């Protein structure tokens, strides 16, 4: 399905070759193959992400000879550690965001609206190599600066305004 295709495409873009199995018998076969190849007697399940019904199916039908161990945050913990290639990709995304802001910063003096400035910043990130923005860019000026997650509005940025920016670039699958 589309989730498997998206995962495949994103992994391929990051230079990773992997079989993607989202659900069903193909998932069971993929996991069983990995458990067998590793000669694993235990299999960790992310307790916050696996339903009770799925856990029972795994325990009684799919892997009756394997001890299932509930885990919490195991995968997230592994993702916290970055290799040199990942650090380089994150640094590249940060550089794109920095260069983009440097390019459009002077436009603040022209009095654009928050929305206009946000659009210019997003476009500048793309011009400098971003595949996308990391999230919806926040531009909040004057009294809007006190609003968490303010959406850029038609308010004009004027001299003396405090301007709060929250933005990021997505480059090669990594966010700044």
Language model features: what each stretch is:
Residues 26-133, 144:
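Flexible, acidic/His-enriched mid-domain "rim/lid" segments that flank
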Residues 2-5, 50, 144-146, 168-170:
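Short, glycine-/Ser/Thr-/acidic-enriched flexible segments
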Residues 1-34, 95, 99:
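N-terminal accessory/capping or targeting/presequence segment of soluble
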Residues 13-17, 37, 59-62, 154-156:
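Short, solvent-exposed amphipathic alpha-helical segments in soluble enzyme
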Residues 37-39, 133, 145-175:
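Acidic/histidine-enriched ion/cofactor-binding microenvironments in catalytic or ligand-binding pockets
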Residues 21, 87, 152-153:
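Short pre-catalytic strand/loop immediately N-terminal to key active-site residues, enriched for Gly-Thr
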Residues 139:
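Basic, ligand-binding patches in group-transfer machinery
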Residues 8-9, 54-56, 174-175:
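Short glycine-/acidic-enriched loop or helix-start segments at secondary-structure transitions
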